[in-house]
Amino acid sequence: MKFDKWINDSEKYEFCKSYGVANIPSMEFKEHQENFYIYLLSYFHEIMETYLEKGMTDDIKKELLDLADGLILYSQNETYEDFYGVNRGQNFLYVSSIYYLCDYTAISSLLMHDIDIEEFPLEASQILAFIISGGGVEKRQKSYDNEEVSWINVKKFIYQGEEIYLDEEISVQDRKYKERDFDSSTDFYMSLVLRCVLRKFKENNLWTSLRAIDPDFDWSSYVRHSRRQHIFSFLPSQQDALNKGLLNFQRAFSLKMPTSAGKSYITELLIHYVLKNHPEDRILYLAPLRALSRELKDHH
């Protein structure tokens, strides 16, 4: 199929540009870049609808990641100047949302690092950026006064952990989509993506993960500490450690995690939980690297 070849070629093109390969051969998708982008968005819509119906599957995840390889050409530094007619920030938001849905939350947050939320006129885009960045991208207006209902719903859930607010926001977005209450085609796509991200966020957030471990424990101070670090959910490796009983150990445990998998953060959680439950206990934390010990000293 022609579009399958275009997506494969777009991956090759991105690789060549990223590694400075000279004399990149002519590729058909680049000569038809407007049609290619329209196809990508149409394909995106189709996959998102399937995701809402069936949830994440291996096939959907693969299709989404292939799609991200095509979309990112229109935004990343090495390639975006070769394309035209696409809002770079909004396109980055599509790509970041895909990585978020596929559990690559660190990548999705990194892509949003230099984004100014004021670039997004649409409420759906702003809320997406806020959730995906862990609050790193936020409106300058801090109070609830005069804020839209959707912002209030999302923030109250994040700050207070009451699921009724997130459920209400999911209902608001579902109703908007059902009634086709959109200001533009971009609003249509962003609202669809937001519906998917909200469902993912409902399943994967700090409040839900921590309460599953100990529903009677007061997690509010730890969630507040995490928000200051722009963390709204655990990384997959961290969640896996929790699911395997990290906080329920009796005498000792061995924590094996890849580099940059969030060991320091998950250790903070362990220390917090132990000392809250056993304030008379003492903890010896050996930091093997000087940089890590300095980081711990700065944070605590």
Segments from the language model and where they lie:
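N-terminal helicase ATP-binding lobe
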Residues: 1-300
